Amino acid sequence: MSRFRTFLLTAGGLGHAPVASGTFGSLPPVAIALLMAFLGQPVWLITLVMLLLVAVFSVACVRFGGEAEALFGRKDPGQVVADEVAGQALALSFLPWADPSISGAAWQNLLLGVGAFLAFRFFDILKPPPASSLESLKGGLGILVDDLITGLMALVVVQVVARGLLGWQSIPMG
């Protein structure tokens, strides 16, 4: 497998972390979303970037996941964290990010990012159905699909808490 493919599947090498590689692999989308929110980027642009991450890392998993399993000698190897990047990016999509110039917006954005991260890690580790049964799919799909499902679960929970319970809405940026 080429260096580029390995770099992509391990999220720049984060998948080689000695412990909690999935947690480390989940961090890049969180950092990108928070940076964009704190810089006042519009919600649509943050969502677009997150969906592009979902697309790029999903394609990488499906296309090169089988090669990675052969290289690392096991199904869904821990070094492959492109699935975590995709799932975490999905969990960060469509959130009610707020303009940082508005009072309290920085806290709202920080809580959204941290909440989405914790919710995704919780569901990714717990693997509630149907995510648990989808891990049995072959190759890259087996690596990816459970993380997309847990990313969707995290997104729903964060949306319900943020919009439903806390009444947060997107505050226009720019």
Description of each model-found segment:
Residues 17-36, 49-57:
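Short Lys/Arg-rich amphipathic alpha-helical segments
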Residues 34-50, 92-111, 160-174:
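Helix-coil boundary and interhelical linker segments in multi-pass alpha-helical membrane proteins
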Residues 117, 121-129, 159, 166-174:
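A short, conserved beta-to-alpha structural element at the edge of catalytic cores
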